[in-house]
């Protein structure tokens, strides 16, 4: 049973729609995404949040939690990560993501990756198999737009290429289409990637004024229609479903 001191935790609210278990390896994130909700959620400033560091004793704490979950015959995958990116630039130095995957696997736990790290994440493809999932967040297809909203994340093409290579290796793939910044671009992402993506999860844009410029009813209708037409496996988050 997980406790308040556990680093593997059961997300609440909107995050629970993406994964029932998660672990955050780093405090903060170096991708500096303009729309990121994590600083507010963690009650810290963006300046502090954008100076990431490994969480203290994180691997040892994962071992404690993973051992407990194995004894309980846990079947749910553990997501890396919600409040940071597992393959942000400093992971090249610390390689916590690789070590965390190895620990989780040693206790028969599956992993679900969510990243904007692009090629950095491919380092660990040799570890992913079976019921593991590799996923990326995609908000746009234009490099200049990406540099505006996600200045230090991998560019969109690099993320898409990493998805394709994961698919070629037989790894289950998924895309988080959240936040939605430009609905027509989100639809185009689906058209360009559906042949090598096993699941799409689609949300909205929360806690940002740009959200008011989007016709959410139209987007919800259009994206559901497209995903159905292409026979994709998909999940629409509650924030989007309410617009249907």
Give the ranges of each region predicted by the language model.
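Acidic carboxylate-rich catalytic motifs and surrounding loops in phosphoryl-/glycosyl-chemistry enzymes
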Residues: 115, 179, 230-244
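Conserved AdoMet/S-adenosylmethionine-binding subsite of the radical SAM
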Residues: 58-227
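N-terminal [4Fe-4S]-dependent radical SAM core
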Residues: 1-77
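Short, glycine-/Ser/Thr-/acidic-enriched flexible segments
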Residues: 55, 85, 241
């Amino acid at each position: 049973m997980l406790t308040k001191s556990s680093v593997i935790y059961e997300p609440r609210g909107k995050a629970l729609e993406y994964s029932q278990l998660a672990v955050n390896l780093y405090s903060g994130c170096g991708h500096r995404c303009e729309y990121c909700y994590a600083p507010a959620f963690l009650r810290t400033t963006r300046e502090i949040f954008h100076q990431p560091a490994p969480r203290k004793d994180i691997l040892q704490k994962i071992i404690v939690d993973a051992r407990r979950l194995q004894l309980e015959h846990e079947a749910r995958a553990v997501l890396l990560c919600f409040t940071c990116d597992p393959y942000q630039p400093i992971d090249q130095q610390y390689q916590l993501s690789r070590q965390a995957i190895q620990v989780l696997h040693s206790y028969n736990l599956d992993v679900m990756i969510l990243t904007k790290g692009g090629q950095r994440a491919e380092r660990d493809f040799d570890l992913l198999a079976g019921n593991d999932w590799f996923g990326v967040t995609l908000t746009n297809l234009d490099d200049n737009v990406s540099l505006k909203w996600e200045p230090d994340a991998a560019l969109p093409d690099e993320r898409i290429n990493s998805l394709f290579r994961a698919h070629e290796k037989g790894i289950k793939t998924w895309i988080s289409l959240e936040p939605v910044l430009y609905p027509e671009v989100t639809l185009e992402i689906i058209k360009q990637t559906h042949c090598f993506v096993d699941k799409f999860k689609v949300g909205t844009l929360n806690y940002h004024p740009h959200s008011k410029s989007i016709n959410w009813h139209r987007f919800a209708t259009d994206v559901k229609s497209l995903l159905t037409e292409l026979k994709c496996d998909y999940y629409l988050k509650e924030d989007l479903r309410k617009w249907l």
